[in-house]
């Protein structure tokens, strides 16, 4: 698979579980995963277990239908950028949001070594209030 195909596989599976399995298949053990400053889950997490605990589990338990809708991808050598839109409804407040987002993935030898998120976090934070 190409780097672009690997990254696409983490978004475009038939189910969230399939996307998660694809992510687990292609990440290095010590992946560096950065959620943007100002985002509710901001920080850098090392290793898929930490990412799952601090990001994915929270997204699944705190939001209704939280998702990333890819608009397009740009690939160059060892980097792939996916950009599009986040949507979801915060369970506690019942408020929905839409936010533009870009994800920068870095790969080495067909393995994902890092992920960095850039997002308009204001609309996400507004849904929390």
Q: Where do the model's predicted regions map?
A:
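Short acidic-aromatic low-complexity motifs
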Residues: 1-30
């Amino acid at each position: 698979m190409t780097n672009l195909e690997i990254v696409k596989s983490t978004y475009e599976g038939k189910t969230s579980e399939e996307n998660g399995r694809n992510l687990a298949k292609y990440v290095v053990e010590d992946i560096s995963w950065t959620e943007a400053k100002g985002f509710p889950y901001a920080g850098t997490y090392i290793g898929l277990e930490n990412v799952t605990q601090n990001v994915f589990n929270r997204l699944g338990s705190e939001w209704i239908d939280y998702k990333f809708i890819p608009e397009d991808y740009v690939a160059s050598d060892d980097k792939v950028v996916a950009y599009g839109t986040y949507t979801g409804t915060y369970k506690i407040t019942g408020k929905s949001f839409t936010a533009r987002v870009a994800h920068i993935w870095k790969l080495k030898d067909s393995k994902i070594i890092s992920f960095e998120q850039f997002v308009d976090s204001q609309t996400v934070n507004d849904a929390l209030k």
